[in-house]
Amino acid sequence: HIESLKAPNCSDNINNLTSVPLIREKNTALNGVELVTSVPKANIDFYSRCQAYVSFFLKLKVPKADERHLDDGKHFTKSNINVCYAAPRSKRKARDWYETQLTVGADVYHKEGYHEKNKPFFVITDDGYWFKAHTTSDNNKQFSAVGDELIMGRWLKGRLAAAGIVNPVNNTLEDTDRLGMITQEMLEEYGCD
């Protein structure tokens, strides 16, 4: 019985396999969100082969793990992807853990082809989601989804949660150890900074 596991029809060295797709964890944080649509894999493959008119890298500004409690304004503990740890908008309710405010650097928003302020465009993610986004604020430096400030966070943080790197937090005011705060180490573990 044990010897049958070595049979070629049952297993092989992964280096010998060429047509087996690698499957990563599925981010389900955007499932059922009204302003988000699932995109079939064939469409994702098509769009990935198309040349983009303009592309840019959004640097996520996050603290190191040992800087999670340094609220001096220099360590990004309450801004960008971690804005959920900033002061609540209401005394009765903490900010949602998925709330993010992606601030784009001047090196990006000065690029030719960077989107104009408040002119919506569509984002198609590599993991199969489609939603409308826009830029706002001075110099178009805020990059966010249209109509729901949690969509971008559900996409970014949802991927980290699906990979088992962080657990979503129900109440950021009660997360006194800030274990739900996204850190440089988490991004490095995921494979992107």
Predicted regions and their residues:
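Polyanion-binding interface signature
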Residues: I44-G191
